[in-house]
Design a protein with these regions (language model features):
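An N-terminal assembly and electron-transfer interface module characteristic of large anaerobic redox
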Residues: 1-481
Length: 481
């Protein structure tokens, strides 16, 4: 039995490898391969290996393939394999990919079935005049419905059972720990293995999707039997190192999927660096790509901010993700929070040593997703703080440390850049100090137009009274201390 997973989420590779080892005893002869779309841009061999695995896979899972550069190279291979494999599950992807889903009698290319019509009725409609703030809970409502649907569909015979399987796969994936990735593969094999592979059915019962906090907190020193993956829902359970910083408090936003996959070294480095600067750190996460639930739960109290600065390490916009963003919603929550907002990012589509040796630095897709889009929300101070390692022993030339971010082949583990994490912590410390300083102790620099220089252009601007505005601004600053 050959199962191939193709996804943008390179950080799931190590989790899938652990899942494969756990499944080896339950499903003898299982081959599980994972391919990260982020590798194809600079590695023709990686793309070719993916195409070959798709061509011989018995079950194919495709996820997070919404960028044309990611799905276009493999779309013909997926289309060719669709009718020849036991099952194909395509989730959270572009329409061209998603419609290739085929699970038993559930075919997304077939005319709408009774089961799908039933699901549309369950979905409900947005009521006209409904408060705009309700959008903040849209993701929460969708997750509740996702958990509820398999329970409802369980009692409907026929195609509905295959539709139920599709939604169970979504549940497994969205809580993508190694346990859930393994359970998803086990579930698909147990239900859809055909021909000589059918002997694998019924060897062991696949577990139900394991649930994890959808909104919560994380800390690297919170790893014990009571806190799966270092996660908790309670501020009181954070270790003392995270709560005793007298200098000030930084609210940290993390990606839940990295925490579930156990791929957190890049986050751990930043958390440690911030704490070493005497800062209290509250590392929070939310399911999906809407950070508002985490902000409201852990960074605000009685409608007011309880942090001195907000730092996002997700690499995405505050509300939305790589495929879309809701700038207006982000502006609303940031105005309510009213603290400096910074967005830093790991390099996702190249390794750290490739980035360090590059004259260009960020790739165009990284500059767009991780810098430009978050800046539309109001973020500033964009900088790299970590990224993927390399399978080869290549020293990163991005700074004088010349670190070797070595990974085992195909693990795609993340790492923290020592110099960058320390620089980021230093900047956040100074921002917190500035926010907490008395107004009389703050120094403000004003820069006005003067180009080209030495040509009498100082403070010139069409239809603007630059010097009058400057004088009024300075007068108001003095009046306010």
């Amino acid at each position: 039995m050959r199962v191939t997973i193709v996804t943008m989420d390179s950080h799931l590779s190590a989790a899938a490898a652990r899942a494969h080892r756990a499944l080896a005893k339950q499903l003898p002869g299982l081959e599980l391969t994972v391919h990260a779309a982020s590798e194809w841009g600079d590695s023709a061999a990686a793309l070719q290996a993916c195409l070959e695995d798709i061509q011989r896979a018995d079950i194919v899972v495709a996820s997070m393939l919404f960028m044309e550069d990611h799905y276009t190279p493999i779309l013909p291979a997926l289309q060719a394999r669709r009718e020849r494999c036991d099952a194909m599950v395509c989730i959270l992807s572009a329409t061209e990919v998603t419609k290739l889903t085929r699970l038993g009698r559930f075919d997304m290319q077939a005319p709408q079935s009774g089961a799908m019509a039933f699901l549309k009725n369950l979905r409900g409609k947005h009521k006209e005049g409904e408060a705009g703030g309700s959008k903040a809970t849209a993701g929460e409502r969708q997750m509740k419905m996702l958990r509820r649907l398999p329970k409802i569909l369980k009692f409907i015979p026929g195609t509905a059972q295959d539709v139920r399987a599709y939604f169970l796969c979504l549940q497994y994936w969205l809580s993508g720990s190694d346990a859930n990735i393994g359970a998803m593969v086990h579930f698909l094999v147990d239900r859809y293995a055909a021909g000589p592979r059918a002997s694998l059915k019924g060897l062991a019962k696949p577990p139900e999707p394991r649930e994890y906090p959808e909104v919560g907190l994380y800390h690297p020193r919170l790893r014990d039997s009571a806190h799966s993956g270092g996660m908790t829902r309670s501020l009181d359970e954070l270790p003392s190192t995270a709560t005793t910083g007298a200098r000030g408090t930084v609210g940290l936003l993390l990606m839940r999927s990295y925490l579930l996959a156990g791929n957190t070294a890049h986050y751990d480095g930043v958390i440690t660096a911030l704490e070493a600067r005497g800062l209290r750190v509250i590392p929070a996460f939310a399911a999906g790509l809407d950070a508002r639930p985490a902000i409201e739960a852990y960074f605000m109290k009685d409608g007011r901010s309880s942090v001195d600065a907000l730092l996002s390490l997700t690499g995405f916009s505050l509300v939305g993700g790589p495929a879309y963003n809701d700038t207006k919603a982000a502006e609303e929550v940031l105005a309510q929070l009213d603290v400096p907002y910074f967005a830093s990012y790991p390099v996702e589509f190249q390794t750290l040593d490739q980035w360090g040796a590059s004259d260009r630095g960020l790739l165009p897709v990284e500059a767009t997703m991780m810098v430009a889009i978050p800046e539309l929300d109001g973020s500033s101070g964009a900088m790299v703080f970590g990224g993927r390692g390399s399978a080869g022993k290549v020293a990163c030339s991005g700074c004088d440390h010349r670190c070797t971010f070595e990974n085992t082949p195909d693990s795609h583990d993340m790492h923290s850049c020592i110099e960058r994490a320390d620089m980021l912590a230093s900047r956040m410390g100074r921002i917190v100090d500035l926010r907490r300083a008395r107004r009389a102790d703050k120094r403000v620099g004003l820069v006005i137009f003067n180009f080209p220089p030495n040509a009498g252009n100082t403070g010139t601007a069409a239809y603007l009274s630059v010097f009058e505005s400057l004088h009024n601004t300075m007068t108001m600053l003095k009046q306010q201390g």
